[in-house]
Amino acid sequence: MDLRSTLLVIGGSACSFKLLNTIVRVLPTPVLARKKAWKWRNVSTSLAHSSLTGAWAVLCFYFHPQMVEDLISSHSVLSHSLVAVSTGYFIHDFLDMAFNQSFKQSWELLLHHSVVISCFGLAVTTRLYLGFAVVSLLVEINSVFLHARQLLLLSGQRNRPGTEVTAPRPSVTYIITSWLNLGTFLVFRVSTLGWMVRWLAGHSEHIPRYILMMGTAGLSLISVMNTVLFYRLLRADILTDTHNTSKNH
């Protein structure tokens, strides 16, 4: 794609995710989630993005396997389109949070999105490092379960009916989602991030200094955020449940 087509795809993607967010607004919302209607819409839209781009990233490597060997210049129309569509989503989500949530609540994600938009924007406009960007989007496979978990919490479906007050017990759906979330977190966030750091370090001599600095800063930020996120998930879904089980016995 040329630059004009790329910008059109990014703009069209941002508008499409905004439209999807609006459609979710008019769809039935679970009673408990109505107290946080904006959050429900935002997470639902994020789930759609994760489902789409996670599968899309896998297909990019399936149909263009040589991209694994050359993450700098090797790419296809499929991979270029994927990164452009994802850039549009992150622009939409950045604006959605900026206008609907306080800075104190959203500054971490706003910072994350700023880094992603900068890196993806560079990749789609120069048509370089698209393979590296597609690797980073494999993380979205984990995000599917992360967002599904959030929706279960927002809709009050974490615990089994009738156990919420006396002895809270997680529902089967929540338990499965939680374990899939933790498992894919280790595979598609931790392992992928480690591989990206290793690749960046191994190819530092072939990468311009400003891009190397951008990549290093971005991966450092995401590493810290992932560490904090994993601790929060463990504390909420494993440590708390273990403590409650011991207490009940």
Label every model-predicted segment.
Residues L151:
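Conserved beta3-strand ATP-binding lysine motif
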Residues M1-V139, S143-L146, G156-H249:
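Membrane-helix and juxtamembrane interface regions of eukaryotic multi-pass membrane proteins
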